[in-house]
Amino acid sequence: MSPLTQTLLMILAAYLAGSISSAVLVCRMRGLPDPRLQGSGNPGATNVLRIGGASSAAMVLFFDMLKGAVPSYLAYLMGIDAVSLGLIAIAACLGHIYPVFFGFKGGKGVATAFGAMAPIGDDLAICLMASWVVLLLISRYSSLAAILTALLAPLYTWWLDDRFTIPVAMLSTLIIIRHKDNIQRLLKGEESKVSRKKRPKKS
């Protein structure tokens, strides 16, 4: 099989894997409202946190990251070049954003993108996760934490393993473009902060 054929097949596989909406499936499994119709309307971990609590959100986050990590790591093991790795990772994110199995209405692609970056190395994964958590705790804005972490990701990659700076920059650009509406709301002071679903008090 030629390198081009390998790359094209991996791009297709990554898109199909990304099209599996973890948020919708977890909410169905747990008897929660459809995240596309509740809260912010975004089928991602942050919205599931709002409507279903931390355990459901953690499941969504894990599976969304896995959708990016598995295709990227498999492509790396196959010896596919760095730029093509970036295209494969973007395909997984586009599957998450425009899922063929769920009416092409998906999430922002943040967890899937960070999952695709994680196989580059444990040190990069730790830097990304630490940055996102710290920025979220400081600002309480999930979107702002994602945007700033996406901006930092190519710098971390250049510092830790510069072979993958270009594909990571490609992913970061996609994340920022996907958050254009959030950026406008942040500038206007209209963006919602993260809050957990409140449990009813026991009588």
Curated annotation (Swiss-Prot):
<dbReference type="GO" id="GO:0005886">
    <property type="term" value="C:plasma membrane"/>
</dbReference>
<dbReference type="GO" id="GO:0008654">
    <property type="term" value="P:phospholipid biosynthetic process"/>
</dbReference>
<feature type="transmembrane region" description="Helical">
    <location>
        <begin position="118"/>
        <end position="138"/>
    </location>
</feature>
<dbReference type="GO" id="GO:0043772">
    <property type="term" value="F:acyl-phosphate glycerol-3-phosphate acyltransferase activity"/>
</dbReference>
<dbReference type="Pfam" id="PF02660">
    <property type="entry name" value="G3P_acyltransf"/>
</dbReference>
<keyword id="KW-0444">Lipid biosynthesis</keyword>
<comment type="function">
    <text>Catalyzes the transfer of an acyl group from acyl-phosphate (acyl-PO(4)) to glycerol-3-phosphate (G3P) to form lysophosphatidic acid (LPA). This enzyme utilizes acyl-phosphate as fatty acyl donor, but not acyl-CoA or acyl-ACP.</text>
</comment>
<keyword id="KW-0997">Cell inner membrane</keyword>
<comment type="similarity">
    <text>Belongs to the PlsY family.</text>
</comment>
<dbReference type="InterPro" id="IPR003811">
    <property type="entry name" value="G3P_acylTferase_PlsY"/>
</dbReference>
<keyword id="KW-0812">Transmembrane</keyword>
<feature type="transmembrane region" description="Helical">
    <location>
        <begin position="7"/>
        <end position="27"/>
    </location>
</feature>
<feature type="transmembrane region" description="Helical">
    <location>
        <begin position="82"/>
        <end position="102"/>
    </location>
</feature>
<keyword id="KW-1208">Phospholipid metabolism</keyword>
<keyword id="KW-0472">Membrane</keyword>
<keyword id="KW-0808">Transferase</keyword>
<keyword id="KW-1003">Cell membrane</keyword>
<protein>
    <recommendedName>
        <fullName>Glycerol-3-phosphate acyltransferase</fullName>
        <ecNumber>2.3.1.275</ecNumber>
    </recommendedName>
</protein>
<comment type="pathway">
    <text>Lipid metabolism; phospholipid metabolism.</text>
</comment>
<keyword id="KW-0443">Lipid metabolism</keyword>
<feature type="transmembrane region" description="Helical">
    <location>
        <begin position="141"/>
        <end position="161"/>
    </location>
</feature>
<comment type="subunit">
    <text>Probably interacts with PlsX.</text>
</comment>
<keyword id="KW-1133">Transmembrane helix</keyword>
<keyword id="KW-0594">Phospholipid biosynthesis</keyword>
